[in-house]
A protein has these predicted regions:
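Terminal leader/tail segments of proteins
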Residues: 4-5, 20-175
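Sec-dependent bacterial lipoprotein signal peptides
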Residues: 1-19
Length: 175
């Protein structure tokens, strides 16, 4: 019975990870957000992509968008937060993979030695650490949403790229 609870906990952690972060490298950060060649690329539901550089420069469909100093600062903040989500996602993925490896190893060892009762508490304690790491991703998504909303209020051209809604940020935090 405890092994079933453990496996359910691991599935919950996997769900947490996949609901927020997709992959790494020159890669996706969220479903609509990726990092390519050192820039953050925001994919609109329809229409051209927007690219944000580390300096806070914005291009839409490859064309520079004129911005004020305040807007550029918000774009730089958006860029930094997107990279933070990716970094937190990588750290969470590594921790979850390590936990999964330990869980499988501990289950096999525990079953082989008839000591399955001690497996659950050890893995559950480590799973709390992974869940806390995953919550950092969710917190970062919520912060990115705030920056996104400030950008939309300040820079109407960014509106098609405001794809994080209140439910998405809240759903991640509630898991």
């Amino acid at each position: 019975m405890k092994i079933i609870r453990l496996l359910a906990l691991l599935l919950l952690l996997a769900t947490l990870l996949t609901s927020c972060v997709i992959s790494v490298g020159d890669s996706s950060v969220l479903n609509f957000l990726s990092v390519q060649d050192g820039s953050v690329v925001v994919h609109a539901r329809s229409g051209p992509d927007a690219t944000i550089t580390a300096a806070g420069d914005l291009t839409i469909d490859g064309k520079p968008v004129a911005t004020t100093t305040e807007q550029q600062a918000l774009l730089k903040q958006y860029y930094d937060q997107a990279l933070a989500i990716r970094a937190e996602g990588v750290a969470t993925g590594v921790a979850a993979a390590s936990l999964a490896h330990k869980a499988v190893s501990n289950v096999a060892t525990g079953l082989a030695h008839g000591n399955s009762d001690s497996i659950g508490p050890r893995i559950e304690a480590e799973a709390k650490t992974v869940k806390a790491q995953a919550m950092k991703v969710c917190d970062a998504v919520a912060e990115l949403r705030k920056t996104q909303d400030a950008l939309v209020a300040s820079l109407p051209a960014f509106k098609p790229y405001a794809l994080i809604d209140a439910n998405q940020a809240a759903d991640c935090l509630s898991k």
